[in-house]
UniProtKB/Swiss-Prot annotation:
This is Protein-glutamate methylesterase/protein-glutamine glutaminase 2. It comes from Oleidesulfovibrio alaskensis (strain ATCC BAA-1058 / DSM 17464 / G20). The gene is cheB2. GO terms for biological process: chemotaxis. Belongs to the CheB family. The keyword Transport does not apply. Residues 6-123 form the Response regulatory domain. Residues 165-356 form the CheB-type methylesterase domain.
Length: 356
């Protein structure tokens, strides 16, 4: 019998604690072993049972989540998923938490439409499973499919002809998930100011991507911004897909631009790496350079294979530097990867491929 992932929920809202408990109780892989209204109660709970994953609110009375997180990571590291409200302060605190060692960010569940609750449940459960795998690499529980895992066909039909206009301008597409916030910082800070245009999908909740892009923009030599529909791809700039919208690469004449679109979850995600990669295969072909980075699941693997078949240069982050070696591993297994490299070597390899 598959081993349950033990979850401890720490949030000062009784409604949030109950909602999360209900969500996890519906997934056979997850088991709530305790709830706590603040970090002091959480410590008491952990004296009797050690969880595999802690779901942690940031803003709490008596001791805030960031202080508790730092204590956990310094004394007894446990994978932590930050459960944050959608506010500017919440987003900033969440990214601070990622710097302190948290592995995922999720948006607090809220009562809304049936579709929102279903999709929110999928994302929350997947985030906890990914966090557990970041430490428990040998975890072998069979994935519980809540909804069908759609392919990129749901957003962009496969291109039978693959008639890509040949151009000399290169464009870079990148996909990441669990552990990607820190990995993308390392990648983009190493990019030269005149680097080729970059489009990025990082699995992240709605409203958090703008703050994430802003933080990167303040530390990188290139411009980093959340993508808007119709943005033209420019050298020295990286565009990050908005949370809850798919990002597609398009071309008009000699210019690349991006399109942001609503649509179903693809590979259980929106935005989806597969959607971005398929659009790059269609509109850039062998003028694209693609990188797939740390993350759980298989989003991006099929799209990278399509890019590889058009002649694009494809790179996967290696297992040693991934928080979760899921997405890169699936891409390698499909045979769509030209090179497997450590995180610190990705930027130079991308620039070299674009200049060759």
């Amino acid at each position: 019998m598959a081993r349950h992932i033990k979850v401890l929920i720490v949030d000062d809202s009784a409604l949030v604690r109950q909602t999360l408990t209900d969500i996890f109780s519906a997934d056979p892989e997850l088991e709530v072993v305790g709830t706590a209204s603040d970090p002091f109660v959480a410590v008491k709970r952990m004296e009797t049972v050690v969880p595999d994953v802690i779901l942690l609110d940031v803003a709490m009375p008596r001791m805030d989540g960031l202080t508790f997180l730092r204590k956990i990571m310094s004394q007894h590291p446990i994978p932590v998923v930050i459960c944050s409200a959608v506010t500017e302060q919440g987003a900033e605190a969440s990214f601070k938490a990622m710097e302190y060692g948290a592995v995922e960010i999720i948006q607090k569940p809220k009562v809304s439409t049936k579709q929102f609750l279903e999709e929110s449940s999928i994302r929350i459960c997947d985030a906890v499973k990914a966090a557990a795998r970041a430490q428990l690499r040998k975890l072998a529980a069979k994935r519980f499919e809540v909804t069908p895992k759609l392919s990129a066909d749901a957003m962009l039909p496969a291109n039978a002809g693959r008639s890509v206009v040949q151009r000399t301008e290169k464009v870079v597409v990148v996909g990441a998930s669990t552990g990607g916030t820190e990995a993308l910082r390392v990648l983009l800070e190493a990019m030269p100011p005149d680097c080729p245009p970059i489009a990025i999908v990082q699995h992240m909740p709605e409203h958090f991507t703008a703050a994430f892009a802003g933080r990167l923009n303040s530390t990188c030599r290139i411009q980093v911004k959340e993508a808007s529909d119709g943005d033209v791809m420019q050298r020295g700039q990286a565009l990050i897909a908005p949370g809850n919208l798919h990002l597609l690469l398009k071309r008009s004449g000699s210019r690349y631009y991006v399109e942001t679109k609503e649509g179903p979850l693809v590979r259980r995600h929106r935005p989806s790496v597969d959607v971005l990669f398929r659009s790059a295969a269609r509109y850039a072909g062998n003028n694209a350079v693609a990188a797939i980075m740390t993350g759980m699941g298989d989003d991006g693997a099929a799209g990278m294979k399509e890019l590889h078949e058009t002649g694009a240069y494809t790179i996967a982050q290696d297992e040693a530097t991934c928080v979760v070696y899921g997405m890169p591993h699936e891409a390698v297994k499909l045979g769509g990867v030209d090179a497997v490299l450590p995180l610190g070597a990705l930027a130079a390899a991308i620039v070299k491929a674009c200049n060759s």
